[in-house]
Amino acid sequence: MLSESSSFLKGVMLGSIFCALITMLGHIRIGNRMHHHEHHHLQAPNKDDILKISETERMELSKSFQVYCIVLVKPKDVSLWAAVKETWTKHCDKAEFFSSENVKVFESINMDTNDMWLMMRKAYKYAYDKYKDQYNWFFLARPTTFAVIENLKYFLLRKDPSQPFYLGHTVKSGDLEYVSVDGGIVLSIESMKRLNGLLSVPEKCPEQGGMIWKISEDKQLAVCLKYAGVFAENAEDADGKDVFNTKSVGLFIKEAMTNQPNQVVEGCCSDMAVTFNGLTPNQMHVMMYGVYRLRAFGHVFNDALVFLPPNGSEND
C-alpha cells in the first residue's frame, strides 16, 4: 500500500510538472491553435499616389496624425534619457518617459518596478487610460533608439488606426512572431484597446512569463496580442527595405562597405527609415543634425506632405 501511495504521489508530481510545461509552451504556440494568420509585410505609401491627393486633403491628413511616444527608462540611462529628451522626442505630438523609480533629474512617470515587462504593461495601460481619446497611434522605444517621427507618420499615412496594427521590425522565435522592442513598437488605438482588455486576464496575458524561464518583454507583448487577434507586421519601404532598424546607422554602413562596397548607399538602409537603435548620446545629437538641420544650399525639398509640430513644441 505504501509503495502504491508513493507511486501515486510521484505520478501526481510528474503530471503537474508536465501540465505546467505544456501551459507555458502554449503561451508561445497559441498562434497555430487559436488563430490562423499568415504574416505579411506592410509597405509605406507610394509617393506618386500621395501627389495625386489634393492639397487640402493633404493638409487635413498631416493634421490628423497624432503620435504619442512612450520611452522606457531606468536611472542608469540618465545620459541617454537627456539626449532623447533633447532630440527626436520633440517631434512626437506628446512624449512621456516611464521610469523604474523616481528620478529627480528628469520628470517621469514612476512604474515602481525594475521588470521591463511590468514596466511596459503599466506604461501601455497608463497611456490608454489617459489618452485613448487624444491619440490614434502609440510608439514605444528604448532610450538607445533614435526615431524620425515624420517618417513614421508618412508610413502610417494610409493605415486606419481603427484596425489592429502592431508594427515594427519582426523577429521569429519558434512559432512566435514578434516586433523587436530594439527597433521600436507601434500600436494603433484598436490594438491598444484590445491589449488593455487583456491586461487583467492573467490566463491570456500574465504578469510573469513562466515558472521556469522568463521571456523578454517584447515576446510577452506578442503573446498577449495574439490572444487579442493582433499579429506582428514587418514595416518596409517600397523597395522592401526595413524602416524600423535594430542597429545603428553606423553599423549598417560598415556592413554595406564590407558586403556591397560598390553600392554602400543602396546597400545600407532605407531613405524612409523610421528608427535606428544602439546609439550613444553623442550619436543621437549627430543624427539630429543630419536629419533635421543640415541642408544643401540651393536645394529645394519637394515633400508632398508637411507634418506640423504640436503647438508649443521646441522641435527643430
From Swiss-Prot:
Against InterPro entries, the record matches this protein to: C1GALT1/C1GALT1_chp1 (IPR026050)
Q: Does the keyword Chaperone apply?
A: yes
What is the membrane topology listed in the Swiss-Prot or TrEMBL record? Single-pass type II membrane protein
Q: Which residues lie on this side of the membrane: Lumenal?
A: 27-316
Where does the UniProt entry say this protein principally localizes?
membrane
Query: What domain of life?
Result: Eukaryota
Task: Write out the entry's keywords from A to Z.
Answer: Chaperone, Membrane, Signal-anchor, Transmembrane, Transmembrane helix
The GO terms describing molecular function are: glycoprotein-N-acetylgalactosamine 3-beta-galactosyltransferase activity
Query: What pairs make up the disulfide bonds?
Result: none
Gene Ontology, cellular component aspect: membrane
Q: Does the keyword Acyltransferase apply?
A: no
Task: Kindly list the residue ranges recorded as spanning the membrane.
Answer: 7-26
Q: Which residues lie on this side of the membrane: Cytoplasmic?
A: 1-6
Instruction: Please name the GO terms of the biological process aspect recorded for this protein, alphabetically.
Output: platelet activation; platelet morphogenesis; protein O-linked glycosylation
* Compartment list: Membrane
Q: Share what the entry says about its subunit structure, partners included.
A: Associates with core 1 beta-3-galactosyltransferase (C1GALT1), probably not with the soluble active form.
Explain the purpose of this protein: Probable chaperone required for the generation of 1 O-glycan Gal-beta1-3GalNAc-alpha1-Ser/Thr (T antigen), which is a precursor for many extended O-glycans in glycoproteins. Probably acts as a specific molecular chaperone assisting the folding/stability of core 1 beta-3-galactosyltransferase (C1GALT1).
Family assignment from sequence similarity: Belongs to the glycosyltransferase 31 family. Beta3-Gal-T subfamily.
PANTHER family of this UniProt entry? Answer: BETA1,3-GALACTOSYLTRANSFERASE, C1GALT1-SPECIFIC CHAPERONE 1
- The protein in question is named C1GALT1-specific chaperone 1
